[in-house]
Amino acid sequence: MKFVKYFLILAVCCILLGAGSIYGLYRYIEPQLPDVATLKDVRLQIPMQIYSADGELIAQYGEKRRIPVTLDQIPPEMVKAFIATEDSRFYEHHGVDPVGIFRAASVALFSGHASQGASTITQQLARNIFLSPERTLMRKIKEVFLAIRIEQLLTKDEILELYLNKIYLGYRAYGVGAAAQVYFGKTVDQLTLNEMAVIAGLPKAPSTFNPLYSMDRAVARRNVVLSRMLDEGYITQQQFDQTRTEAINANYHAPEIAFSAPYLSEMVRQEMYNRYGESAYEDGYRIYTTITRKVQQAAQQAVRNNVLDYDMRHGYRGPANVLWKVGESAWDNNKITDTLKALPTYGPLLPAAVTSANPQEATAMLADGSTVALSMEGVRWARPYRSDTQQGPTPRKVTDVLQTGQQIWVRQVGDAWWLAQVPEVNSALVSINPQNGAVMALVGGFDFNQSKFNRATQALRQVGSNIKPFLYTAAMDKGLTLASMLNDVPISRWDAGAGSDWQPKNSPPQYAGPIRLRQGLGQSKNVVMVRAMRAMGVDYAAEYLQRFGFPAQNIVHTESLALGSASFTPMQVARGYAVMANGGFLVDPWFISKIENDQGGVIFEAKPKVACPECDIPVIYGDTQKSNVLENNDVEDVAISREQQNVSVPMPQLEQANQALVAKTGAQEYAPHVINTPLAFLIKSALNTNIFGEPGWQGTGWRAGRDLQRRDIGGKTGTTNSSKDAWFSGYGPGVVTSVWIGFDDHRRNLGHTTASGAIKDQISGYEGGAKSAQPAWDAYMKAVLEGVPEQPLTPPPGIVTVNIDRSTGQLANGGNSREEYFIEGTQPTQQAVHEVGTTIIDNGEAQELF
């Protein structure tokens, strides 16, 4: 009895000592423990998703792939699979399972190694949310105390739901929703028992047991899960026997991107990061953009095709690499495919290796091990590249171009395969809605994998003749008209700084003598533009350009401005052309229409300032767009008067008046009216002539009329000195687009080519806006305007139509006449007298015309 007594006393002392030690340990660790109450408001890290305007996924950003699901959305069999495998006594313990610990310890003692884990689901949750992955005794102790606290705070179902959404399951998949998508391309409710068991087996070692890494290990682990489910009575013997014999059909499933718009998606990502920091990638934001699949894909296709066409006509630069030389032992297929898999793809261009070649045909292997045939049709274009201005002879047989062992690039053209090469030239396209500035399409380069530099928004390039419509607008705002006569004869002026004569020339160097301003713009006459610049003044012209949104620091105050020496981005150019297309309003380009949080709540919605060409004052108001909504004294108080429209109004004054009126009325906010609507119509009409010309002369953009087969379009070519940059910018109903092409290396020019006869409809001669940039503009605009009814140019109030003499710009007095538009009060009043000849003085200098 005495022994029993002492034993009981010792036991009680041990228990008290143990309890005291545990309490002391708890008191020591408690200040270091995180507040588990935050679990009530825990936010799952959900990636940012970017959508098109019509709701299609175009990009996803975030390190963790997660698709949150509620417990009732998860099949019961899947829940049981996790419980059976990870914590069979989950509904019986209070965060820590002594039975499980004892069982794991016993197995470890008798087997000599730890083959069973003792962590409950609650402990795993505590570790995943609050603790580091380090394997230390202190972390394990903290894990135990946190698990107990969590059990006191949350219900079992809440713990289980949080766990099944937080657990890491390999390949950046967190939670069962993401794992179902990553491995099987399904939602959780579509999974089979086989697939559920595979996923339930992953928490122990996601990198080792996933079926994409090792199918054998995945099968073995799946069978362990099925055995545990059978032991717990969750499945029948028949289900077990059937499922364990099934194959695991797993593949990596990336997020289902409907279509790609990488340059615009990157712009969205940067904007979201600027707004929300790192949480942009974790808080489940859904961003809706302004682009649509049809329009964006048309833009990307137009740019890529045009770049490839330019690249082909300039010749083949040779194979990308030589894997083995002719006469050496060929590589085996595995070595070839491993090498090709390590190479990127660029748009339609795929890496390939030539495995055989004869005069009629070559065979090339792709990265997936398949082979394609390259006939003479697919290599005929590949005359040797010698320089940007010189190409070699057209090849006569396939082996003139291809040899066994070469690593090349190929692309599919219809049913055939063609030799290709990664282009060195690059291009950009920006398309916006001129009425509100919404970006309709944006392409920042040939391929985002090739270069992430966004030429649409970041490349400052000289604009060449693309600047002329803006400068002619300035000239007409100061008194010139579309019928004003300017002398198209050579100019020579001494440049003291350069120590030589400055002699701007037309391209081509052809001169017509006195011509009307409309023809000067339509034929892109450089000397005519210089004369107009001199007539209005360089400083006036440079300052006027700022009305179109062009930054002052990029505008030179010299006569070379007339030839486009200023540098702007394609986005800035498109914005400027929108002013001419929308009646004179400077809209702001924008590309995010709406941002939603992870619950679907709208936290941002775009409210762009819009154009209103029907309104007759610079600052408008109200929903009806009528000037009599307010009393006269209200209009005088906050609006720019009608008389002020035709004078230079500082931009801040326009903005302040606009904001004041909006604050007063709660009205739609309108974009600044930077040029009056009649003037905008005149330059819009002139851009139309740039495409369609007149009897006796052809506009530089004539190909657009041929390609689009509609007359409600207008545009302007642009080519810089030495053809280093080529542009085409213009409008159609509801759309303005600017295209640029050139080399990132500013030292290179676009050169010229000779016709080879090997390329159907090959462009030849000197590269420039009409040949190098316009084909992309034409192709894109044709696709965008397909099915859009023609909308004839309709003169706004304030425009009068007068019959003028073509050769003098005066009132017509017989034949050789055309109808011309004028702002009321600026039309000619004198009859044409042909004997006088010209209104330009003999020394080539422009007369005072106003």
Which residues make up each language-model segment?
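Active-site SXXK
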Residues: 82-83, 229, 299, 359, ...
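Mid-domain, small-residue-enriched loop/turn segments at the edges of structured enzyme/sensor domains
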Residues: 500-506, 537-575
